[in-house]
Amino acid sequence: MGTSNWQNISYNIELVRKLDPDSILDVGVGFGRWGILFREFLEIWDNGRYDGNWQRVIDGIEIFPGYIKDYHRYFYNEIFLENALDHLQNSEKKYDLIHFGDVIEHFTKVDGTRLIELALQKGKYVLINIPIGRYWAQDGTEDNPFEEHKSVWYNNDFTKFRYHKIKTFY
């Protein structure tokens, strides 16, 4: 299972707490880091409730079923096991926040751009975490070919979108 840098965690959680979304779509669930952290710091942190009767919707998309374990079902309301681009093209559901945690680079540049455009249509806010630059090449694995990085992204790739804020972590 792929994993991601930790340097951006507190920054992301602070942003999401300020946005205070009632509904989140976590694209690329993987280990479940972001869904768990969003659940903790949007619901448990302030009221200490662990009963699973959540007030917010946190859904996820994961293309590789082998990543989804029993614990995911506690933190996520629903997990869609499909390609994120297909899901966003076919779903009518809208979210306050659509989050991409190291996902966009697993698509071609054309498909990744389309994915962002769809998210901007279906989300009030879109938060993207992505490795920047050419030093993040990654092949798929024998178990999961979807781990392959199919595109390289730079900060200026995101400036074409109407509203954007870019923060780089090293």
Which residues does each PLM region occupy?
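Conserved alpha-helix/loop element of class I SAM-dependent methyltransferases that forms part
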Residues: N5-D20
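Conserved class I S-adenosyl-L-methionine
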Residues: D22-G30
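Glycine-rich phosphate-binding loop signature in dinucleotide/nucleotide-binding domains
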Residues: L19, N90-K93
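S-adenosyl-L-methionine-dependent methyltransferase catalytic module, highlighting the catalytic core
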Residues: G2-Q7, R33, L85-Q89, F100, ...
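Nucleotide donor/acceptor-binding cores
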Residues: P21-D22, R56
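Conserved acidic residues
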Residues: D22, N77, D96, K124
